[in-house]
């Protein structure tokens, strides 16, 4: 069994979701198989063994406090929000009112963006466009980024058997009727 840092496991999980078109964007059905921006990032870290959802992270507005309680540090003053300089793989970038993404390195981020209709809910399950959840170049968000959070327990590892397939959710709130 391979050992992987929690940072790498969170990034790998988010990338697997972005690269699997059975997962799309939806704010109503957001805990799998579809995700919105915050549930994607929260789920990636929860799957990596960092209990951010358990500690109360549920949307962009309360992510920061839950992530800080789980070993993240606010490194906003150490990075350039306009260019992305100083960011590291796994950094969580947040605008507390609107959006969140994860920095994956080399000037790239993984993000859940919008559904196939250009809306936040009401689309079909899965990624219809290949752009609902995707990897893209880092950008300075139109409303500005509020903070960058970095997981500082980098020596913490977790066993993994497969870095790709996320577990299916059994939460009833995720089932479309």
Segments from the language model and where they lie:
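N-terminal capping segments
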Residues: 1-58, 64-65, 75-76, 88, ...
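Catalytic Cys-His active-site segments of thiol-dependent hydrolases/isopeptidases
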Residues: 54, 102-136
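Surface-exposed intrinsically disordered loops and tails
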Residues: 65, 69-80, 120-139
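Short, well-ordered loop/turn sites that connect or cap secondary structure elements
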Residues: 81, 85-88
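Residue-level preference for short coil/turn positions at secondary-structure junctions
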Residues: 88-89, 105
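Low-complexity, Gly/Ser/Thr/Pro-rich intrinsically disordered linker/tail segments
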Residues: 134-177
């Amino acid at each position: 069994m391979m050992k992987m840092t929690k940072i790498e496991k969170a990034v790998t999980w988010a990338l697997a979701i972005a690269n699997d078109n059975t997962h799309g964007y939806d704010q109503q059905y957001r805990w799998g198989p579809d995700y919105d921006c915050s549930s994607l990032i929260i789920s990636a870290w929860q799957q990596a063994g960092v209990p951010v959802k358990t500690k109360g992270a549920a949307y962009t507005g309360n992510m920061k406090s839950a992530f800080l309680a789980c070993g993240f540090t606010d490194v906003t003053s150490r990075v350039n929000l306009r260019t992305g300089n100083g960011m590291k793989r796994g950094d969580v970038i947040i605008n507390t009112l609107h959006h969140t993404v994860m920095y994956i390195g080399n000037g790239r981020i993984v993000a859940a963006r919008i559904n196939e209709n250009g809306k936040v809910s009401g689309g079909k399950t899965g990624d219809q466009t290949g752009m609902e959840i995707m990897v893209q170049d880092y950008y300075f968000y139109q409303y500005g980024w509020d903070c960058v959070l970095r997981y500082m327990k980098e020596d913490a590892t977790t066993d993994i058997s497969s870095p790709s397939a996320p577990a299916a959710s059994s939460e009833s709130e995720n089932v479309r009727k």
